[in-house]
Amino acid sequence: MALALLEDWCRIMSVDEQKSLMVTGIPVDYEEAEIQEVLQETLKSLGSYRLLGKIFRKQENANAVLLELLEDTDVSAIPSEVQGKGGVWKVVFKTPNQDTEFLERLNLFLEKEGQTVSGMFRALGHEGMSPATVPCISPELLAHLLGQAMAHAPQPLLPMRYRKLRVFSGSAVPAPEEEPFEVWLEQATEIVKEWPVTEAEKKRWLAESLRGPALDLMHIVQADNPSISVEECLEAFKQVFGSLESRRTAQVRYLKTYQEEGEKVSAYVLRLETLLRRAVEKRAIPRRIADQVRLEQVMAGATLNQMLWCRLRELKDQGPPPNFLELMKVIREEEEEEASFENESIEEPEEGDGYGGWNHEGDD
């Protein structure tokens, strides 16, 4: 970042970047005379120079200055930092071989990818470029063009690492390395969301983890619907390989869950919601009637006061049942109203309290 700033600044000032320095980290309250005093002392081995300008760098909350060296200087004599008043100032400069190093790294990178610089230019529509002209192009332009090439490259061709799924076959006798279906499905559902590729590539990666009947099912659902999504494929696996017993267990656990002693109705509904969603995921309860089932279970499994019972009964009779948040809002409002009423009852003085409650037996 600092080197790029040096190069841009030199272009603006029309000076040779190989004969220029940039000093950064200078406190903003330093005057030019104070800066010159420090630099003359610390850079005297470089010979004469002139200060071309000063800018403020917001990211450092400090100033930077550009210097032009007026004499030929050995780059090995240029310090990487100088001790200024109030801290260390960084010295940024460009070595003569940095452009060559960049080109070497670029060629090495493209070689590993099976490409060439000329091929990169052709892919971007720059047919006139040849290997002979590449050294004449600035590293900044090459870096920009390389970034374009990476951005336009087909996503599956880019080198990437991805979390692979464990093997699943769906066989009656699973292999020792296989996970139970429920464990595999939970892992697969999470991991496929992380894969930064197209749906087609996701389905290919999913198929790589399948064997036997599971792989056969994958081929069948794709043949029936070539545009099927990965999520729909996993849903098909649930229907075929999912445990029916686990569905019944989820349904019974939900229907047999009641409000516990001392538990608020809102806390019961929140606990119940986790079980309901699990039952819906296992297809033990149809998603389309989840709101209705929730309301009925709350009315059957909770201890409700008369006011809340009437409100819930009204919601059930009048129209579409409330969703989770709507139901929770009704219950919380009733709980707050009931708590407010109880507080008022406690604060209200009972008969015989106050000044009129004194014992006057001693009065005549």
Swiss-Prot record:
Biased composition (Gly residues): 354-364
Compositional bias segments (type: Acidic residues): 335-353
Alphabetical keyword list: Acetylation, Nucleus
Pfam families, per database record: PNMA, PNMA_N
Annotated positions of the N-acetylalanine modification: A2
Superkingdom of origin organism: Eukaryota
Descriptive protein name: Paraneoplastic antigen Ma2 homolog
Underlying gene: PNMA2
